[in-house]
């Protein structure tokens, strides 16, 4: 996984003629309740993200399926749109890479309507997680 992902990142950097900044978690805000973990960020200047990168390194049969469809698999749309929301960018590149097959590189545009509908679901999920953490913390304190 990680070795192939490094190869994919290098391929992308050459194909797009850009530097790819590796990073860990990126937080939506200082509260740090919502984050994403991009496989790379493309910066116009330090701290000025212009695009993100999501890399998938599927098995050969899955890569062939992706290539034949020529589209981003629907299961990755929430991840890509959510990452654009968190990083506040208008595009995110999806790269599906297998070392023995043609890469699939698609630029996904930000969908503000999708993000608007996603925010309440995300906030509800985060609230439920926080409630669960609080309950566990109180149980441990009581024990």
Q: What are the residue ranges of the model-derived segments?
A:
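Accessory terminal regions of nucleic-acid processing enzymes
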Residues: 1-143
């Amino acid at each position: 996984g990680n070795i192939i992902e490094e190869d994919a990142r290098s391929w992308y950097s050459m194909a797009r003629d850009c530097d790819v900044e590796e990073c860990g978690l990126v937080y939506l805000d200082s509260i740090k309740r919502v984050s994403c973990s991009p496989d790379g960020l493309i910066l116009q200047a330090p701290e000025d993200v212009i695009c993100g990168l999501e890399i998938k390194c599927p098995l050969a049969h899955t890569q062939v399926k992706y290539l034949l469809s020529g589209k981003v698999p629907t299961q990755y749309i929430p991840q890509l749109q959510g990452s654009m929301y968190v990083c506040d960018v208008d595009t995110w590149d999806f790269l599906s890479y297998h070392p023995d097959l043609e890469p699939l590189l698609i630029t996904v545009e930000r969908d503000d309507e999708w993000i608007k509908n996603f925010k309440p679901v995300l906030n509800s999920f985060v609230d439920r997680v926080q409630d669960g953490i609080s309950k566990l913390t109180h149980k441990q304190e009581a024990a």
